[in-house]
């Protein structure tokens, strides 16, 4: 036996080990990820060498990683059949020569970095001391004999030729002598969970030694023989052969010879493969079945349903990576929960899990897409949890967005599937319109809306444009609280009578989306409730409109005088046919619906609200009997109290029908009551109560004051 040699750790390594041992880290579990990752690297190396020299695999043909928990001795063994280490490798790699990243890692650690970054500096092996008092490494390289490396991290380590442990053939066995309080890492469930969490997609089988209890029926004489055999381990194999021979003789014959039988339990150790989910993304898409995709998706997402769509692709060129993306059938209830840690895209480098919360890998509007991205050469810096070059990420991100849009277009081909998809994720698409300027036009093609002509179906912008009226330039839409509300809106009266189709946008996020989406296929999007609406009219219609405008000019001036600064201007309308009047907003200000949405924001910016709330324009229908009668009354006496009351009443009703909220509901009710009394010819005794109402001028002043108060609120 070769003498044991003692070596001193390099100063930096000694300092690093001291830091690991004497500092408390909550996530000690990362040691297993690091050791499995190192084992995978060792297996990659021998597999690579065997491409040109196949005989190198003969010393141990199987490629595997094995975990062996031993509760009796309080040890956890991580074994692999990789390339192994020579004596020189053990001395140099595990102690005397510090890697370039050792110092940098300690600096990062002392600056508040995470212990889980250790593997990025090439010193992941030392994470073993997070859970172990001492570590034994047994290794066999094809070019050397089997050696043992041992250290209790006391500043030195020993190396000697091995004559104690079972021959490996080739590979490395790391034996962790666990600290007293780290027994959890001997539990079968804990080890399985850790492998599933961090190392499920390592491309080599990870096997766990598990104890299985089997019950079998034996004769009493057999039982006695087996008890004797248990005392001599080397005779066990012979006993099993004997048992096999006896089974062949038949149960009946055994019963005759030996009499009674009884059931006994025996415990055997078996290898259970933990990473059964093979990396599907490494295979060609045409080789993977739908069942495999479904199984993989469920394993990845913990979803109880199968996926709705899948995209399996690889990118080569500036950056090489493979990816597998899934669209779920339903959105999670907390899809837009801002505090939730995102973990939908898992990032791997050469099948080693790096992170699942990389915010830069996919935009927020695609946060429902689940999947895996695996790069062969993605550069990393301090940790597996932080990436070094944003340029690389931008390439990955750009490709993922492109492929997601392709996947959505594929879903679109099946109307029933797309209806399910759109019901669940339409808000995400609209958020994409708002946030993703580069892909806005493509996302717009995916949007669907109900319309004045679509009935229960939904229509796309493309379908709308294809069936536009001859000569129609703009795409008309209306925003509102519900389909029923917008369908009955006075703003649609003229458009629908002339046969124009109007899109109904009733989702609050539609307001934000159309602010960014100005046009589709060179057709401007035009809101029916705002100024600037152009409806094609004949020359005769235009002439009649101008004549009517001149006729109503005195009334329009009177309405502006009465309403004062409640409206910016009063004009004759060419957009309504059945309603007496409506209130429209400026083209670039908030619509009535947007105003309603913003007022509901608990944390709204009131200064912004007062700035964006548009000055309203009152549009009067010159063909409506009410407006004609008021015009006639005003021509007789423009200071008539009833005329002024009616103007205020029309303003309040226009607020409601145009989608605004009432500014003074009490005063509105008072005016209604006054009109009711007038209609019922209430006598003078009741009229006294009317005197309690403030005069119109005061009502107007109170409204102004309330408006100011709302701005301050």
From Swiss-Prot:
Gene3D superfamilies for the chain: 3.30.230.80, 3.40.50.11260, Heat shock protein 90, C-terminal domain, Histidine kinase-like ATPase, C-terminal domain
Motif (TPR repeat-binding): 709-713
Record field: compositional bias (Acidic residues): 685-703
GO cellular component, one term: cytoplasm
Residues holding ATP: 38, 125, 384
Membrane-spanning ranges: none
InterPro entries: HATPase_C_sf, Heat_shock_protein_90_CS, HSP90_C, Hsp90_fam, Hsp90_N, Ribosomal_Su5_D2-typ_SF
Basic and acidic residues composition bias: residue spans: 226-264
Keyword Signal: no
Chief localization: cytoplasm
Region entry Disordered, spans: 212-264, 685-713
Gene Ontology MF term list: ATP binding; ATP hydrolysis activity; ATP-dependent protein folding chaperone; unfolded protein binding
A Pfam family this chain is assigned to: HATPase_c
Domain of life: Eukaryota
Keywords: ATP-binding, Chaperone, Cytoplasm, Nucleotide-binding, Stress response
Subcellular location: Cytoplasm
Purpose of the protein: Molecular chaperone that promotes the maturation, structural maintenance and proper regulation of specific target proteins involved for instance in cell cycle control and signal transduction. Undergoes a functional cycle that is linked to its ATPase activity. This cycle probably induces conformational changes in the client proteins, thereby causing their activation. Interacts dynamically with various co-chaperones that modulate its substrate recognition, ATPase cycle and chaperone function.
Assembly and interaction partners: Homodimer.
Domains as described in the record: The TPR repeat-binding motif mediates interaction with TPR repeat-containing proteins.
Protein family membership: Belongs to the heat shock protein 90 family.
Protein name: Heat shock protein 90
Primary gene name: HSP90
């Amino acid at each position: 036996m070769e003498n044991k040699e003692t070596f001193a750790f390099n100063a930096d390594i000694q300092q690093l080990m001291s830091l690991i041992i004497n500092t408390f880290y909550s996530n000690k579990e990362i040691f297993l990820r690091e050791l499995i990752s190192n084992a995978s690297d060792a297996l990659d190396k021998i597999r690579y060498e065997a491409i040109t020299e196949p005989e190198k695999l003969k010393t141990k043909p199987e490629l595997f990683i094995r975990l062996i928990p031993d509760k009796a001795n309080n040890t956890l063994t991580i074994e692999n059949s990789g390339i192994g280490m020579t004596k020189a490798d053990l001395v140099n790699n595990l102690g005397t020569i510090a890697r370039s990243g050792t110092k940098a890692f300690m600096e990062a650690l002392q600056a508040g970095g995470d212990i889980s970054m250790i593997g990025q500096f090439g010193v992941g092996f030392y994470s073993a001391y997070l859970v172990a008092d001492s570590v034994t490494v047994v290794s066999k390289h094809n070019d050397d004999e089997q050696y043992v490396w041992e250290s209790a991290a006391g500043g030195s380590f020993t190396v000697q030729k091995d004559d104690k442990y079972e021959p490996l053939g080739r590979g490395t066995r790391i034996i962790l002598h666990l600290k007293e309080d780290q027994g959890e890492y001997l539990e079968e469930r804990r080890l399985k969970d850790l492998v599933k969490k961090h190392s499920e997609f390592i491309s080599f089988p990870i096997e766990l030694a598990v104890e299985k209890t089997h019950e079998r029926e034996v004769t009493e004489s057999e039982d006695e023989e087996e008890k004797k055999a248990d005392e001599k381990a080397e005779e066990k194999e012979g006993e099993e052969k004997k048992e096999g021979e006896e089974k062949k003789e038949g149960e009946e014959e055994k019963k005759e010879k030996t009499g009674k039988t009884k059931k006994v339990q025996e415990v055997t150790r078996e290898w259970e493969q933990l990473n059964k989910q093979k990396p599907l993304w490494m295979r060609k898409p045409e080789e993977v079945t739908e069942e495999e995709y479904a199984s993989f998706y469920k394993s990845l997402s913990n979803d109880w349903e199968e996926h709705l769509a899948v995209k399996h692709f690889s990118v080569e060129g500036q950056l090489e990576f493979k990816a597998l993306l899934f669209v779920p059938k339903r959105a999670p209830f907390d899809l837009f929960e801002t505090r939730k840690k995102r973990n939908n895209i898992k990032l791997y480098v050469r099948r080693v899990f790096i992170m699942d919360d990389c915010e830069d890998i996919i935009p927020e509007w695609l946060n429902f897409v689940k999947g895996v991205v695996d790069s062969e050469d993605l550069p990393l810096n301090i940790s597996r949890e932080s990436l070094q070059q944003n340029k690389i990420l931008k390439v990955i991100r750009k490709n993922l967005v492109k492929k997601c849009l392709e996947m959505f277009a594929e879903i679109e081909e099946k109307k029933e599937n797309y209806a399910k998809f759109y019901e669940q994720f339409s808000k995400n698409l609209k958020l994409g319109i708002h946030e993703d300027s580069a892909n806005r036009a493509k996302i717009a093609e995916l949007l669907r809306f109900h319309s004045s002509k679509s009935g229960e179906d939904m229509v796309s912008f493309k379908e709308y444009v294809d069936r536009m009226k001859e000569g129609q330039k703009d795409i008309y839409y209306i925003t509102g609280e519900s389909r029923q509300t917008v369908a009955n809106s006075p703003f649609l009266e003229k458009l629908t009578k002339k046969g124009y189709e109007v899109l109904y946008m009733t989702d609050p996020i539609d307001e934000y989306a159309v602010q960014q989406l100005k046009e589709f296929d060179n057709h401007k999007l035009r809101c029916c409730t705002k100024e600037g609406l152009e409806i094609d009219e004949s020359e005769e219609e235009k002439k009649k409109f101008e004549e009517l405008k001149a006729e109503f000019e005195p009334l329009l001036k009177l309405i502006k005088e009465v309403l004062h600064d409640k409206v910016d201007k009063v004009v004759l309308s060419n957009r309504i046919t059945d309603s007496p009047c409506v209130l429209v907003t400026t083209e670039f200000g908030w619509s009535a619906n947007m105003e309603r949405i913003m007022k509901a924001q608990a944390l709204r910016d009131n200064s912004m609200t007062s700035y964006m709330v548009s000055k309203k324009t009152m549009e009067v229908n010159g063909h409506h009997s009410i407006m004609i009668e008021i015009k006639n009354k005003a021509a007789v006496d423009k200071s008539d109290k009833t005329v002024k009351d009616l103007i205020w009443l029309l303003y309040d009703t226009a607020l409601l029908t145009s989608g605004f909220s009432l500014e003074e509901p009490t005063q509105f009710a008072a005016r209604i009551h006054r009109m009711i009394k007038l209609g019922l010819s209430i006598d003078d005794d009741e009229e006294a109560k009317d005197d309690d109402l403030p005069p119109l001028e005061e009502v107007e002043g109170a409204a102004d004051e309330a408006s100011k108060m709302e701005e301050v609120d």
